[in-house]
């Protein structure tokens, strides 16, 4: 019987349970951060349990971290959560990358960066964008607080096996279009719930040509399509990325041979298939209050189809028929677990080099990890941003979500490389427009969105 990539990994991790029912799945890697870990640790204490596998658990600080002055934590809840993580990590023997640590950063950036994320693994984290790690040919998904405690105590998790969906992506990428545009265009076409109940695998010639950073962007936003899991089969690009990293297997050739067995036997093994041709792809921009409310940069904002559209337009302060290039902008944000890797920063810097921000724009550039920040400084990418008038920040989740000081003011429009444009996501009353790093950088220079395929 033909199997998908997802099937093969799932079947090697079933501890108990029958097909068609909830099954107990072994977890190879549990990533934790300061926001969703305090209660689970308290649960271990109250039941007098130990952390079952500290060696398969890794912690970092990201959500609450101030990126302008990392050691000046004014919000008391943020300080409490971070102090609590330090104490819990010490008590239970969990490796922790704390504020100021060279290995600190956004959990979905530092996991791959350190070589923790590997093909064939089951990876969980108390964060919805854990699907990012599926870019390596792993089953990776976000879990709730009670599930975090279950994994801590048992190194397993109960899950009902989802169906599988293949998204076949073909064609040659047009100039200045990126993985962010692919996933945004797919979600705009099919909606924010078409992946519900499915594990998604991206495949096809276009996917094979993508870098690991680009694949991570694709898988990161699978949750915005309704799927908990997004995946790409491991290949030489994957192996080259992992090689030499801190936690790369010492017997690397043996690991490669093992990883190479994880692929979909035939596309007929998928329960559902969607095809997407990128040949005529244009840079995408969101206009509303969910990632499906998006259109190409050379288009006008769409007509109102229902009450959701009307409410979105009312919140965002726009009207149908306005060209995307006329959307007013006040801020740009380049960062988040979607697009804060070195490759993303290099693309954005290339758009800004030798130019200066428009006078109406405030720009925050937030690298995804300390290592990325250091590399960007060493290669003078940071200088390009600073010369353009941007604020070059410390690593953290930053303005992706309103849980730290980096909040977009009410009523202000921000071009953002993050993954969600929900109401209030980047600050109470903030108005978010998602786009690729290249698009956001170009918008910062022009003061509005521009069609970068014509640059």
From Swiss-Prot:
Q: What catalytic activity does the UniProt entry give for this protein?
A: (2R,3S)-3-isopropylmalate = (2S)-2-isopropylmalate
Gene3D superfamilies to which the protein is assigned, alphabetical: Aconitase, domain 3 (3.30.499.10)
Q: What is its EC number?
A: 4.2.1.33
Report whether Lipid biosynthesis shows up as a keyword of the record: no
User: What are the protein's GO molecular function terms?
Assistant: 3-isopropylmalate dehydratase activity; 4 iron, 4 sulfur cluster binding; metal ion binding
**How cofactor binds (record note)?**
Binds 1 [4Fe-4S] cluster per subunit.
List the pathway annotation: Amino-acid biosynthesis; L-leucine biosynthesis; L-leucine from 3-methyl-2-oxobutanoate: step 2/4
Question: What task does this protein carry out?
Answer: Catalyzes the isomerization between 2-isopropylmalate and 3-isopropylmalate, via the formation of 2-isopropylmaleate.
Similarity-based family: Belongs to the aconitase/IPM isomerase family. LeuC type 1 subfamily.
Instruction: Spell out the protein name for this chain.
Output: 3-isopropylmalate dehydratase large subunit
């Amino acid at each position: 019987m033909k199997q998908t990539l997802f099937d093969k990994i799932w079947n090697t991790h079933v501890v108990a349970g029958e097909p068609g029912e909830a099954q107990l799945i072994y977890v190879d890697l549990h990533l934790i951060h300061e926001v969703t870990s305090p209660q689970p640790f308290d649960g271990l204490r109250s039941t007098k349990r130990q952390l079952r596998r500290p060696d398969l658990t890794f912690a970092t600080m990201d959500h609450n971290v101030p990126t302008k002055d990392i050691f000046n934590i004014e919000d008391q809840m943020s300080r409490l959560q971070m102090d609590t993580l330090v104490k819990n990590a010490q008590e239970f023997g969990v490796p922790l990358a704390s504020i100021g640590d060279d290995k600190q950063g956004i959990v979905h950036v530092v996991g791959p960066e350190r070589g923790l994320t590997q093909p064939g693994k089951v990876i969980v984290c108390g964060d919805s964008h854990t699907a990012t790690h599926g870019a390596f040919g792993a089953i990776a998904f976000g879990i709730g607080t009670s599930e975090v405690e279950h994994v801590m105590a048992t190194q397993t998790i109960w899950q009902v096996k989802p169906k599988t969906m293949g998204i076949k992506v073909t064609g040659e990428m047009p100039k200045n279009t990126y993985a962010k545009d692919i996933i945004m265009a797919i979600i705009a076409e099919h909606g924010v719930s078409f992946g519900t109940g499915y594990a998604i695998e991206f495949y096809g010639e276009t996917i094979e040509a993508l870098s690991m950073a680009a694949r991570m962007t694709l898988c990161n936003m699978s949750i915005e399509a309704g799927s908990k899991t997004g995946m790409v089969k491991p290949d030489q690009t994957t192996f080259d990325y992992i090689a030499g990293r801190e936690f790369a297997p010492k017997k690397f050739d043996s690991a490669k041979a093992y990883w190479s067995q994880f692929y979909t036997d035939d596309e007929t093994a998928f329960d559902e298939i969607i095809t997407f041709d990128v040949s005529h792809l244009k840079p995408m921009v969101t206009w509303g209050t969910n990632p499906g409310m998006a259109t190409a940069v050379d288009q006008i904002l769409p007509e109102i189809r229902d009450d959701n559209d009307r409410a979105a337009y009312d919140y965002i302060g726009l009207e149908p028929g306005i060209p995307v290039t006329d959307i007013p902008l006040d801020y740009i944000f380049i960062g988040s677990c979607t697009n804060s890797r070195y490759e993303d920063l290099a693309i954005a810097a290339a758009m800004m080099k030798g130019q200066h921000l428009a006078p109406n724009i405030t720009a925050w550039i937030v690298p995804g990890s300390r290592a990325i920040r250091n590399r960007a400084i060493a290669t003078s990418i940071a200088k390009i941003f600073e010369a353009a008038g941007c604020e070059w920040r410390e690593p953290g989740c930053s303005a992706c979500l309103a849980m730290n000081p980096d909040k977009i003011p009410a009523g202000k429009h921000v071009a953002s490389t993050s993954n969600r444009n929900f109401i209030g996501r980047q600050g109470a009353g903030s108005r978010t427009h998602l786009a690729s790093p290249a698009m956001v950088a170009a918008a910062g220079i022009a003061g509005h969105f521009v069609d970068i395929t014509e640059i």
